[in-house]
Structure formats: structure tokens, C-alpha cells
């Protein structure tokens, strides 16, 4: 456009029009500090074609008294119509760019200087930045359009000029003298390449310094995926299977890669940091982070995989935010394809999300591309994050691990273990979860709603509510190599080819998932809402006098301080009264006053919701509650009998709640808890016997409330075993037993007023049945019918009668005995 007087006239008009809005300044270098030789011709190199950048450059040169880039210039006999060129050449008429080619102007300049020993040309690399640096920009709107490493289109550039044009900065760099390069006598082509390389490195380093590093691998990685041997083979197989041309199958693989890969940008990270800082301060009273220093120590030299528990959609944003604020690289986060929505999906992708389909079944090409993508992330050292639970927990419990991502990780590590992999469990605890009411509806039977871009606007409703504090605890890291050394000592000597899938993979992956879940539970952050929910839900009327509730909470705190669950578990500050005041301020408990004081209770709206927060810490209290349960029906028990009954029930509690102790450690922990219960006055020791308090005493009430913490879990166990025994050997399949258990639990919840939908959660029954099979108590025949060992009767009656009241056992047995065909086929 600037090659003729007419073009220069039009360009001048456009520049003046642009500067009706744009304001620019030169940073770092001035015309005085460039050390230009005014007797030698000056050229300007811009990184890529942009008319607005050229106009800003021309304006700043005019202002600084530098030669204008749009005017003709001579180098010996060479006459150039303009004194600028783009390092990336102008696109052709189809919009294509030959990035490997050299700018024609640079080719001619090198030739002219080479042929005329007295000539030289000074090339000044010039960078134009629109807006402030992302690190200093505080406006989220402006950060959306700030300079980035991504290639921008004309519409985005127009919006960038309109939004950021008032703070445009130009940086002139020290000139490159072509004479110095030519004197190396490398020949024409190598000299041109040398000049290009110098400018490319310069532009990249400068851009990194100004807008942050290029942390996106998308532009280079996706194309590289299809050249990996495993993906090439999958492409060939796809072409043969679907009778497609090879190029078409390869194009499909590229589409999969683009669908999956994240597009990390520093500006998006800064945008999210600014927006989320405002958001957290609006809805939360603070974010408490514990044990992050161990991650800061382990991150260098390791491939870090963050494995947080999954309670809310904002888990991923919260963790990335905290890592960034604490000087750690935000991870690439696995997100469900359902979140790849318009606007939101693009922002999440630029913030580090990579998207995965819910199932890979029946699509080997997609599987190959996804596996290779993850393998590339791991081998290049990018931190990664995924949720081993798969989806968000609607009940507040730790869900059974989904092992798909763990299996991919394990196979990638076997394929290349040069970079040690470490899993970092992250427990995220909310005093009030954003989706609480949604979970409540889903637990009551409402269908799960599909995510929509309109859901964003629902967030604004949350700004009027109080959500308390958020607790983020980093758990004990799991070194994958060390884990494999324990599980499969000879794994290092085995031949681990790209397609290697050892026989022990599935079992080892399952154990890895259980280990991650246990480490997550070990890092639990116990908060005031958890403890108040635990106390009130243990009462028959969901209510307690304020003084009584204070005593219960003080007891819980004393027990937890005396027998810490793990070094990574954290407790709330303050005493029982302080905890009550905190929960009251969040409107999670109702109150009624009378002449004797205040009664705190859970109303119908909050009763079910509070089961969510109780379940967050159920595993912490499982063992002391189980010990307390034995004294509801027995006034005294020997240490030997207590140990026997705890060992009988422990495998099932451990499988459901991911308790941390091995069977070998159990006796020591039982003794610690018995000492604590004695010191708190809930039990009395008489030689080898433990004796409960008098039923009329305050201590017995406290013991009863502690025991009721685990009652519903034990009821479910008893339901399943009673149904099995009353059905007889080889009469029920596992699926039929699950259905019967759910219907029975629904009926009992009505009869006994159990206001907890997870009481009849099918997955809990399913996992209990699986554990019975694993323990050898059940056996499935060829037709899938279940038979049981004599141990089941001992478990059902011998142990159950010690921990469940006679009334409850009778009610469960009656429903089990009197079930008929209608019960099996109808809903209750």
C-alpha cells in the first residue's frame, strides 16, 4: 500500500484516522539511544503483516525524527520503494503464508550489501504492543484482547485497536548491521537465514519479556501428534477399516487433536486471575491453603499430576488460580467435552483445559490421538490435572475412582520413565458448595441438567449469598516409580514397548486409584459446617439445645486433636461456641428460643443439604463411631472382642470410606481411640474391659451421638446381608440384590424418617456387594447367582446385633422376610 505516492497518500489518511483514537508511545529505546549511523540507510523489520502496526511505527518515527518506514530508500544501486518489511512474508491472494521463505526485501538487501563492499544497511527490529503488559493490566475486559502468542484475525485486531489502542507501546531494538553478517562469508542463503534467525530470536525474547512466555504447545503439538508411530498406525487402520483415503483419515486425526488440545495463553491466565480474585472475594470469606510448600519443593524435576477431589465446577479454576498465585505453573486440566461450550469452552481451553469425550469405546483413532497427547504432555514436563472420581460428588463422599486416566498415565510412564511422575492429591473443602441446591434436586430424583452457556448468568445469583471459607489442602505426594516398586518389583526390567499392556496393569491401576482416594481423604479439611452437620444429623429430631451442641462440638474437637486422622488433616480454629456462631451466620441452621435458651435445628430445606457436608468428614469419625456403636447394646466389652468385631467390619468400611489404615495397623489405632474415649469420659476402663457410662448421664448421650454417625452405613450393610440370607443360596444375582437393597432402603427411610437420599444410593450397595465378593464371603456362579459363606451369617447377626438397635434390626428383618414379587418389581 505504500509503494507509490498515491498509496502513501491513502496510507497517511488512514494513519490520521487511526490516531483519532489511538495513543502510542516509545518504550525503552529512543532515537538517541539507537546509535544509528545516519549516513547509512535504515530499514524496519516488523514480525508479521499488520497495517495498524505499520501506521503506529510510522507515527512514532515521525515523532522521534527517525527515517519514515513508508518512504523510498537506496542501498547503492538498489532502490527500495519503502524502508520496512515483515519477517513473516505477506500472504498470497488465498491468504496463505510461506513462513519458511525469506522476505524479498531482506533477500535484496543482503545481495546489495554483498556485492558492494562499501555499502551497509541497518535493520531495526520493531515490536508494537497493544495495551499494558498482562502482568500489570487489571481490567479483565482488556486482558481478553491483550497481545498473545496466538495468530489473530482481522476482526480481533480491530477489537484490539478499539479496546486497547489508547495504551499502545512501540519498542525499537538495537539495529542489526548487515555488513557485519556479510563479512562472515557464509554465502547469500546462509546470511539471509542468519539475519532471519537473529530477528526471530529477538522478537521471541522481547515478546516473552513483555507479555509472558509462550506456554501454549497447541500450534506445534497437534500437527506432531499425527506423526507419532502409534497414531500413524491408527490412521492406517482407520483408513482400511472405514475404506477411506489415508489423507482423509489423517485429517480426522488432526480434527481430534484440535478438539482435545488446550491452547494455553498467559493473557488468559491473567484474565482468569483478575476475574477470579474478584469472584472469590465476592462470595467467599477467604481461601485457606495448607501444605503447598511440599509441592513447591517437589515440582522442579518432576512431572506433577494434580489429582483433586471433585466437589464443584470451580475446583479446576480454584486450583489453577492458587498454583499461579503461589508461583507454580498452572496445570493442563482434563475437562469433559460437555464443557466445550461457545465462549466458555474457548476461555477454558486458553486457561489450560483439554477436552475429552466421556467414552473412547469404538473409536481407536480418537483413543490413539488422546493417549499420544497425554504422553506428550508427560514427557515434555507439563503439569497435568484430572479428577480420579470422574464426575462431581453429589453426596459429599469420595466417589469410587475411575481408573481410565490413571491407566493412560501408567502406560505412558512404562513407555518412557525418564521424567519421574508424582501424583499430588488436593483436597478442596467448601463450607458451602455453589451447586448445593442442584445436588439436592438430583439426589431427590431430578435428572441431571446438561451444561449450558446460560448457566454463567446463574453465578450472579450466588453473589448475594454467603459461602463461607474454602480450604485447599495438599496431601502426601505419591511417586509413581516408588508405587510400582512396591506393587510390581520387577517392572523396570520388563520390555515396555509403545503397545505394552502388562497383565498386572488393571489390578495395579485399581490399587493406585484407591491409594489416591485414601491420600485425598487424609488431606481432609474439617470445617465448622462439617462438625455442626455431623452433630445435628446424629439426633433423632435434627435439633439440639445450644449448650448441648457446644458440648458435642467440643468433644469432637478434643477427640480429633488427641487422635489426628493424618498429618495432612486440618481442624477449624476456635471452640464449639465459635463454630456454632460461624454456621449460624451462614444461615445453615435455624433456631428457636424459649425460656430455657436456644434450640438449634435443621429445617426441611437444609436437613438434606447438610448430609453433604457431614459426608465430607464421615471417614474421619468412622472408627471412633464404630467403637462407640458397640456400647449402645452392650454395657461392657472386652478389648479382645472389640478388636474382633472391628476387624470383621473394617474391610467394608475401608472400601466405602477409603480409610487409611491397613489391617496390620488397626489394633494400634483402636487402642489410641479407646484411650481418647476413656480420657473424654465416654468409656471407663476396668482392666481388660471397657464400660459405658450410666444411660442417664450426659456422657452416655455424647457416646450415643458419636455412635449414630456411622449408623446408616451399618444399616445398609445389614440390609444387604439380611436380604441375601433370607433369599437363600444361588437365588439372587448381584444386580437383583442391588435393586432389592435400594427399594428396601427407600421403604425404611420412610418408616424411620431418614432424610438422606444417599441412604438408598445404588452405587454404595453395589460397592458393598463387590467387597463381599473380594473378601470371599460371596461367590457368583456361572449364571451370576450369588452364594454365601457361613461368615455372612456371623457378619449379619453376630456383629450387627452389637452395633444396631434391636428395633432397627427387627424392622430390617421384617421387610426382608415379607418381600414379595411386587416388592421386586415396583418402586416403594
From Swiss-Prot:
It comes from Pseudomonas putida (strain ATCC 47054 / DSM 6125 / CFBP 8728 / NCIMB 11950 / KT2440). It is found in: Cell inner membrane. It catalyses: sn-glycerol 3-phosphate + an acyl-CoA = a 1-acyl-sn-glycero-3-phosphate + CoA. This is Glycerol-3-phosphate acyltransferase. Signal peptide: none annotated. Keywords: Acyltransferase, Cell inner membrane, Cell membrane, Lipid biosynthesis, Lipid metabolism, Membrane, Phospholipid biosynthesis, Phospholipid metabolism, Transferase. One of its GO terms (biological process) is CDP-diacylglycerol biosynthetic process. One of its GO terms (cellular component) is plasma membrane. Its EC number is 2.3.1.15. The HXXXXD motif is essential for acyltransferase activity and may constitute the binding site for the phosphate moiety of the glycerol-3-phosphate. Pathway: Phospholipid metabolism; CDP-diacylglycerol biosynthesis; CDP-diacylglycerol from sn-glycerol 3-phosphate: step 1/3. It is a peripheral membrane protein. Coiled coil: none annotated. SUPFAM superfamilies: Glycerol-3-phosphate (1)-acyltransferase. A motif (HXXXXD motif) lies at residues 310-315. It comes from the Bacteria. Belongs to the GPAT/DAPAT family. One of its GO terms (molecular function) is glycerol-3-phosphate O-acyltransferase activity. It is an enzyme of class 2 (transferase).
Amino acid at each position: 500500500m505504500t509503494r507509490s505516492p498515491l498509496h502513501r497518500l491513502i496510507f497517511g489518511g488512514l494513519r490520521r484516522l487511526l490516531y483519532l483514537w489511538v495513543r502510542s508511545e516509545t518504550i525503552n529505546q529512543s532515537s538517541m539511544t539507537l546509535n544509528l549511523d545516519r549516513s547509512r540507510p535504515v530499514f524496519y523489520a516488523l514480525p508479521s503483516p499488520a497495517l495498524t502496526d505499520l501506521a503506529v511505527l510510522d507515527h512514532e518515527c515521525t515523532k522521534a525524527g527517525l527515517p519514515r518506514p513508508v518512504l523510498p530508500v537506496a542501498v547503492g544501486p538498489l532502490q527500495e520503494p519503502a524502508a520496512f518489511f515483515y519477517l513473516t512474508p505477506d500472504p498470497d491472494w488465498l491468504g496463505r503464508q510461506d513462513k519458511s521463505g525469506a522476505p524479498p526485501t531482506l533477500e535484496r538487501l543482503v545481495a546489495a550489501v554483498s556485492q558492494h563492499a562499501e555499502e551497509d544497511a541497518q535493520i531495526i527490529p520493531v515490536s508494537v504492543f497493544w495495551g499494558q503488559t498482562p502482568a500489570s493490566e487489571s481490567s479483565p475486559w482488556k486482558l481478553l484482547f491483550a497481545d498473545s502468542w496466538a495468530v489473530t484475525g482481522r476482526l480481533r485486531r480491530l477489537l484490539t485497536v478499539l479496546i486497547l489502542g489508547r495504551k499502545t507501546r512501540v519498542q525499537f531494538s538495537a539495529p542489526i548491521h548487515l555488513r557485519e553478517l556479510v563479512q562472515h562469508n557464509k554465502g547469500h542463503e546462509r546470511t539471509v537465514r542468519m539475519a532471519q534467525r537473529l530477528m526471530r530470536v529477538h522478537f521471541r525474547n522481547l515478546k516473552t519479556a513483555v507479555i509472558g512466555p509462550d506456554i501454549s504447545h497447541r500450534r506445534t503439538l497437534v500437527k506432531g501428534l499425527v506423526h507419532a508411530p502409534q497414531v500413524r498406525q491408527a490412521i492406517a487402520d482407520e483408513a482400511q477399516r472405514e475404506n477411506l483415503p489415508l489423507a482423509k483419515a489423517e485429517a480426522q486425526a488432526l480434527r481430534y487433536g484440535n478438539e482435545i488440545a488446550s491452547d494455553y495463553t498467559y493473557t488468559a491466565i491473567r484474565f482468569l486471575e483478575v476475574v477470579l480474585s474478584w469472584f472469590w472475594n465476592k462470595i467467599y470469606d477467604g481461601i485457606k491453603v495448607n501444605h503447598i510448600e511440599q509441592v513447591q519443593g517437589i515440582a522442579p524435576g518432576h512431572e506433577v499430576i494434580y489429582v483433586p477431589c471433585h466437589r464443584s465446577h470451580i475446583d479446576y479454576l480454584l486450583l489453577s488460580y492458587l498454583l499461579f498465585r503461589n508461583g507454580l505453573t498452572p496445570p493442563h486440566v482434563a475437562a469433559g467435552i460437555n464443557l466445550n461450550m461457545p465462549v466458555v469452552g474457548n476461555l477454558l481451553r486458553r486457561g489450560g483445559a483439554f477436552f475429552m469425550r466421556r467414552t473412547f469405546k469404538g473409536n481407536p483413532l480418537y483413543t490413539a490421538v488422546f493417549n499420544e497427547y497425554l504422553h506428550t504432555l508427560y514427557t515434555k514436563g507439563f503439569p497435568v490435572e484430572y479428577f480420579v472420581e470422574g464426575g462431581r460428588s453429589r453426596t459429599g463422599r469420595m466417589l469410587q475412582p475411575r481408573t481410565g486416566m490413571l491407566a493412560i498415565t501408567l502406560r505412558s510412564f512404562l513407555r518412557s520413565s525418564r521424567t519421574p511422575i508424582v501424583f499430588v492429591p488436593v483436597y478442596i473443602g467448601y463450607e458451602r458448595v455453589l451447586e448445593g441446591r442442584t445436588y439436592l434436586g438430583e439426589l431427590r430424583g431430578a435428572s441431571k441438567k446438561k451444561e449450558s452457556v446460560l448457566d454463567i448468568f446463574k453465578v450472579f445469583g450466588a453473589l448475594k449469598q454467603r459461602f463461607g471459607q474454602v480450604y485447599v489442602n495438599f496431601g502426601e505426594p505419591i511417586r509413581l516409580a516408588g508405587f510400582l516398586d512396591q506393587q510390581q518389583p520387577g517392572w523396570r526390567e520388563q520390555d515396555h514397548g509403545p503397545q505394552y499392556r502388562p497383565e498386572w496393569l488393571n489390578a495395579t491401576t485399581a490399587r493406585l486409584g484407591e491409594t489416591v482416594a485414601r491420600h485425598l481423604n487424609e488431606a481432609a479439611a474439617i470445617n465448622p459446617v462439617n462438625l455442626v452437620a455431623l452433630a445435628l444429623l446424629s439426633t433423632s429430631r435434627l435439633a439440639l439445645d445450644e449448650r448441648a451442641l457446644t458440648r458435642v462440638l467440643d468433644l469432637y474437637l478434643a477427640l480429633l486433636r488427641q487422635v489426628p486422622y493424618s498429618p495432612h488433616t486440618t481442624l477449624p480454629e476456635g471452640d464449639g461456641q465459635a463454630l456454632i456462631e460461624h454456621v449460624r451466620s451462614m444461615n445453615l441452621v435455624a433456631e428457636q428460643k424459649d425460656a430455657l435458651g436456644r434450640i438449634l435445628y435443621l429445617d426441611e430445606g437444609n436437613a438434606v443439604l447438610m448430609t453433604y457436608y457431614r459426608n465430607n468428614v464421615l471417614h474421619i469419625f468412622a472408627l471412633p463411631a464404630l467403637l462407640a456403636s458397640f456400647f449402645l447394646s452392650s454395657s461392657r466389652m472386652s478389648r479382645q472382642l472389640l478388636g474382633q468385631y472391628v476387624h470383621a467390619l473394617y474391610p467394608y468400611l475401608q472400601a466405602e470410606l477409603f480409610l487409611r489404615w491397613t489391617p496390620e495397623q488397626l489394633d494400634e489405632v483402636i487402642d489410641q481411640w479407646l484411650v481418647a474415649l476413656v480420657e473424654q469420659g465416654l468409656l471407663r476402663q476396668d482392666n481388660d474391659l471397657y464400660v459405658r457410662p450410666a444411660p442417664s448421664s450426659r456422657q452416655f448421650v455424647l457416646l450415643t451421638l458419636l455412635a449414630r454417625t456411622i449408623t446408616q452405613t451399618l444399616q445398609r450393610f445389614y440390609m444387604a446381608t439380611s436380604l441375601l440370607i433370607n433369599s437363600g443360596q444361588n437365588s439372587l444375582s448381584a444386580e437383583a440384590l442391588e435393586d432389592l437393597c435400594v427399594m428396601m432402603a427407600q421403604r425404611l427411610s420412610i418408616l424411620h424418617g431418614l432424610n438422606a437420599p444417599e441412604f438408598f444410593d445404588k452405587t454404595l450397595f453395589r460397592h458393598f456387594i463387590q467387597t463381599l465378593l473380594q473378601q470371599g464371603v460371596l461367590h457368583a456362579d456361572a449364571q451370576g447367582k450369588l452364594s454365601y459363606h457361613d461368615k455372612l451369617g456371623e457378619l449379619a447377626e453376630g456383629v450387627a446385633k452389637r452395633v444396631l438397635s434391636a428395633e432397627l434390626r427387627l424392622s430390617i428383618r421384617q421387610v426382608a422376610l415379607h418381600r414379595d414379587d411386587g416388592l421386586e418389581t415396583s418402586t416403594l
